[in-house]
Amino acid sequence: MYENLKSLGIQEPTSVDSYTLRQEANHDILKIYFKKQKGEFFAKSVKFKYPRQRKTMLVDSGTHEYKDVTEINANLKYVVDELDNLTQGVHIQADPDIKQKILRDLRHLEKVVQNKISEIERDLEKL
């Protein structure tokens, strides 16, 4: 059982506490956290980087337009399935991180747009 995790070098899959999965450019980053042992200040973790699989898909059959898309690596799917069985959904903790990043990006965008509007208004006043 848990052959995919063992192939990654995780000899004791039952020691897995949680995991996060995120996408960076053309890679998926899987970080696995282990249960904290007595006397440890921080739980141990390991990180794995998987290239995303590229596919060319037909978008419009009338114009024969194709689009390049990426999707999760097939091996990573199996690893995530095993991690889900072990953690029973504990990986959900990564969602607030994503939400916070999106909120920070949104606030930054608001500032950029507001500064641009102010700049355009100043230019208009000069006319």
Curated annotation (Swiss-Prot):
Pfam families: DUF3461. It comes from the Bacteria. Coiled coil: none annotated. Belongs to the UPF0325 family. This is UPF0325 protein ASA_3165.
